[in-house]
Amino acid sequence: RMPGVMRNGKKQFLVDTNIGKASWNEWYEWIEGINDDLPEPEGLGDVWDNLPDLSPCLIEGILRKGHKMLIAGPSKAGKSFLQIELCVAIAEGNKWLKWDCAQGKVLYVNLELDRASCLHRFKDVYTTMGIEQPQYLQNIDIWNLRGKSIPMDKLAPKLIRRAAKKDYVAIIIDPIYKVITGDENSADQMANFCNQFDKVCTELGCAVIYCHHHSKGSQGGKKSMDRASGSGVFARDPDALLDLIELETTEALLKQEENNATCQACKEYLDAHFNWQDDLTQDD
């Protein structure tokens, strides 16, 4: 407006001054506070007799769909193989480390291996698990990002956009040190980093599973949640935490495992060829 100037036969006036916000930043903070997308508080009494259903289990007794899980372990301990095995278990609806897995589609975000090595590992894991003729290969998608990784706060929106219509039940990110945003020893920066996993879980409704390495030095005197390298936020943030440690393979342990394998082989043979359970009594 131009005060004193005629417009369409009418004189323009300056109505008021010094109203509104003093700067763009001040106005932006004000409008963000009004237009936030946060949910409203709810009264416990309103839902007491009609509680929402718990999310179904993805890994029985360990992880629910829509939750987060951290796998921590020493460097070069086989964490990638373990996560590939988890991909296969979810895709095929099999057991993983003796835990039942719900069947569904899974996205494996490969940040460390070259494409050929990653694909060969998947086939090797299938073969080692005794699955010669996979039935649900279409349930596994692999996103190869070696050499193209970016910080998680920039990766999350791209990941959400690509996965929005895929109906994944789980997204596995291997490893997270490739996409860490900020200093891993800073609690506030790692809290912001872990918030990106929450964003993926919320937007896609799937579980997010990621692995991280142990800190340097001996881990024997530490609690499991203190072994992951960096800030303690890593251990406090996920809904489930699996920690991998290397056990000393003594002669007694090797003998025990050999006996267990022998007994299992004998049981499988008897189950396949005889009705031995009907012929034996409790005294036999």
Spans of model-derived segments:
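Generic preference for hydrophobic
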Residues: 2, 108, 142, 254-256
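Short, surface-exposed amphipathic charged segments that create phosphate/polyanion-binding patches used
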Residues: 8, 13-19, 150-161, 254-260
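The Walker A/P-loop phosphate-binding site
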Residues: 37-127, 132-133, 142, 157, ...
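Conserved inter-motif catalytic segment of the P-loop NTP-binding fold
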Residues: 101-192, 199
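DNA replication initiation modules
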Residues: 1-37
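Phosphate-binding/switch region of NTP-binding enzymes
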Residues: 70-71, 76, 80-81, 150, ...
